[in-house]
Design a protein with these regions (language model features):
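Short, flexible coil/linker segments at or flanking structured domains
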Residues: 2, 26, 42, 49-51, ...
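Non-transmembrane, amphipathic alpha-helical segments
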Residues: 2, 27, 31-35, 64, ...
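Intrinsically disordered, low-complexity regulatory segments enriched in Ser/Thr/Pro
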Residues: 1, 75-126
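Conserved non-transmembrane functional hotspots
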Residues: 26-28, 68, 140
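Intrinsically disordered, low-complexity regulatory regions enriched in serine/threonine/proline
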Residues: 2-18, 22, 105-142
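Amphipathic, interaction-prone secondary-structure segments
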Residues: 48-96
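Contiguous, amphipathic alpha-helical segments that mediate oligomerization or scaffolding
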Residues: 16-57
Length: 142
């Protein structure tokens, strides 16, 4: 095999990898910006309303904003919470919820999209409310 052919293929692979990395960085930056808007305009107000409704029902949850995030934590257990996160592990970055639930000595931890397959910009207040109601079911059963 000729050296020029090998050099050409390696150069093409480097250019493709750099272009892919640039696209990935741009996608991540726009997703972070959209996620910030999502937290501020949708997730925080709806979660605050849910926390108030839970308090009225006698179920104690506290709303917190650790490190620019949003967490709805059960007052009974320090490991019981629902936290909004940006899930960039897939092809399309998504707003997701990290649900941590302790049962005895076990802690169940899972990350669930707010609305599977939906871009962050497409989410609505109803989507956030539906996600929270589903995520809260284990605590509401008690």
């Amino acid at each position: 095999m000729e050296v020029s052919h090998v050099n050409k293929r390696v150069t093409m692979a480097i250019e493709r990898a750099r272009a892919s990395a640039q696209t990935r960085r741009q996608t991540a930056a726009s997703a972070e910006k959209a996620y910030g808007v999502f937290l501020e305009t949708l997730a925080t107000p709806v979660t605050r309303q849910v926390a108030n409704a839970l308090k009225v029902a006698g179920i104690a949850f506290t709303l917190g904003t650790p490190g620019g995030g949003l967490r709805l934590a059960a007052d009974r257990g320090r490991d019981d919470f629902i936290e909004f996160v940006l899930d960039a592990s897939g092809d399309i970055p998504q707003a997701a919820g990290r649900i941590s639930l302790s049962r005895g000595s076990r802690t169940i931890d899972e990350v669930v999209p707010v609305k599977p397959g939906a871009a962050i910009e497409e989410l609505t207040e109803e989507d956030v409310l539906e996600f929270l109601v589903r995520a809260l079911e284990p605590w509401l059963e008690r």
